[in-house]
Structure formats: structure tokens, C-alpha cells
């Protein structure tokens, strides 16, 4: 613009949103059962269960959704599981693990994906999904009270 710019703006009115967002996805969630760093070895084995939404070596906590199950039910998983080393296996053999790229979650995608028992955490660096009740026994208790 070389220092000169013209901006036009047109506004008619505010209206309530009339679009009904269907928030119920058919697949369940993969939920972390413990707190710590997600290990690539564990995530490699969890890839078969569904789509992951977190990269490896990221901090996770109990109740955090780390992926979406390929089936309808929620599944509590351990993303911190490490490979058992024996005298025959060396720790350098971990380098052969290749993870599929995680699904990036935007705020819009997160709003579309959440179920009634889930929440969205928005921080300056990340957007995370989590269960309303972080402890597994609290989630089961809530599920029983609904039925």
C-alpha cells in the first residue's frame, strides 16, 4: 500500500447460531491411565487401536484423551509403557520404531469431536481433549448413574 490503505467494513446484525452441531462421534476415545511422558514404544503399539492425536515424548496425564478408538467404546491405555530389556535386547533397538503422524487438533475440530463427558483444554501452546472426570473409577461411577 506504500503507506496508504483503504479498509471497507460492512455489518448488518448479530444473530444466534441456527446450525445444530452434532457432537456425538461414533468412535470412542483412547484415554491415558497415568501421568508422564508418552513413550514412542507404547504409542507404536497403540496405533493399532485407533488414531493418535498426540506426538511422542509429550507430557500426558490421567484422563487425557490421546487418540480415538477404532471401536465405539472408550479404552483406557498406558502410553508410558516401555520395552522390557533383557540380556539379548539392547536399548538401541528402539530406533526402528516408526510412528504414523498424529492427527492435528484445531479448536474447530475439537468442538466438533467432543462428547458430553469430555472437555477441551485450550492453552497458549496446545489444544487438548480430556474427560470430565479424570480418574477411571469416577468415569465408571458417572456412567452407572446415567444408566
What are the residue ranges of the model-derived segments?
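Accessory interaction regions appended to the cores of large information-processing enzymes
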Residues: 1-147
Amino acid at each position: 500500500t506504500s503507506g496508504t490503505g483503504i479498509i471497507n467494513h460492512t455489518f448488518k446484525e448479530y444473530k444466534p447460531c441456527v446450525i445444530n452441531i452434532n457432537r456425538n462421534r461414533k468412535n470412542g476415545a483412547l484415554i491415558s491411565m497415568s501421568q508422564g511422558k508418552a513413550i514412542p514404544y507404547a504409542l507404536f503399539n497403540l496405533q493399532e487401536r485407533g488414531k493418535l492425536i498426540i506426538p511422542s515424548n509429550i507430557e500426558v496425564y490421567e484422563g487425557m484423551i490421546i487418540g480415538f478408538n477404532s471401536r465405539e467404546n472408550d479404552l483406557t491405555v498406558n502410553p508410558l509403557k516401555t520395552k522390557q530389556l533383557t540380556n539379548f535386547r539392547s536399548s538401541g533397538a528402539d530406533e526402528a520404531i516408526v510412528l504414523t503422524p498424529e492427527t492435528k487438533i484445531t479448536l474447530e475440530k475439537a468442538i466438533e469431536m467432543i462428547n458430553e463427558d469430555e472437555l477441551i483444554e485450550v492453552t497458549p501452546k496446545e489444544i487438548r481433549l480430556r474427560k470430565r472426570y479424570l480418574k477411571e473409577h469416577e468415569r465408571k461411577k458417572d456412567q452407572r448413574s446415567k444408566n
